[in-house]
Amino acid sequence: MNYEGKTKIVKVTDDYALLEFKDDITAGDGLKHDVLTGKGSICAETTAILMKYLSEKGIKTHLVEYIPPRTLKVIPLKMFPLEVVVRLKKAGSFVRRYGGVEGEDLPVPLVEFFIKDDERHDPMVCVDHLEILGIATREQAEKMKEAAVKATLALKEFFERANFELWDIKYEFGLDKDGNVVLGDEISPDTFRLRKKGEIFDKDVYRRDLGDPLKKYREVLELCRSLNSQ
């Protein structure tokens, strides 16, 4: 059984799934769209490196194996229709909603839940909404929150070794066959904000038309390769 989303194709078998990364890049709930040759392979390898790192930190991920150049072999998950965002600094939609200066530190990691729904612009919800709407139980939501914060702090530490700042990051979670909450989808410049001395190394380059996003994505991959080998 196959599924195709905006940036990935999922091929499901009995035991495993194959996540094939496309070269598409989107923004604004899919209203902005381009194809960048090579992006899929960059995001696939970046995801593989970072998920392997998180697994070593005790965080359950769906990664089984990276199959070059653009495919991940993963554990099949029943995905929650959610984006789980962890913010370390004020940026993006947080500033639009609440004000403040982009790049200001938040006192503690802030976790937000958004329903994946482009037509409704991914509405933000609380744990009570998740329960009432039948999306996730309170226990599942707490497990997602706990794993998301733990992963974010681990990745913050990873990038700080090269003096990069992780500002925020989006995760997606699902349930494995035993009902465990597991980190799925991807971890790449498509899903996090990464900065160094004011320079942008993430999808904001594309959102804001600030240059060649593929160049920045390649630099992030090279950074991950270098840090992973240390």
Swiss-Prot record:
UniProt-listed CDD domains: SAICAR_synt_PurC
Protein name: Phosphoribosylaminoimidazole-succinocarboxamide synthase
Gene3D superfamilies: ATP-grasp fold, B domain, Phosphorylase Kinase, domain 1
Molecular function terms, GO-annotated: ATP binding; phosphoribosylaminoimidazolesuccinocarboxamide synthase activity
EC number: 6.3.2.6
Biological process according to GO: 'de novo' IMP biosynthetic process; cobalamin biosynthetic process
Enzyme type, top EC level: ligase
InterPro entries the record matches: SAICAR_synt/ADE2_N, SAICAR_synt_PurC, SAICAR_synthetase, SAICAR_synthetase_CS
UniProt record similarity statement: Belongs to the SAICAR synthetase family.
PANTHER family the record matches: MULTIFUNCTIONAL PROTEIN ADE2 (PTHR43599), SI:DKEY-6E2.2 (PTHR43599:SF3)
Pfam families: SAICAR_synt (PF01259)
Catalytic reaction equation(s): 5-amino-1-(5-phospho-D-ribosyl)imidazole-4-carboxylate + L-aspartate + ATP = (2S)-2-[5-amino-1-(5-phospho-beta-D-ribosyl)imidazole-4-carboxamido]succinate + ADP + phosphate + 2 H(+)
Pathway noted in the entry: Purine metabolism; IMP biosynthesis via de novo pathway; 5-amino-1-(5-phospho-D-ribosyl)imidazole-4-carboxamide from 5-amino-1-(5-phospho-D-ribosyl)imidazole-4-carboxylate: step 1/2
Keywords: ATP-binding, Ligase, Nucleotide-binding, Purine biosynthesis
Top-level taxon: Bacteria
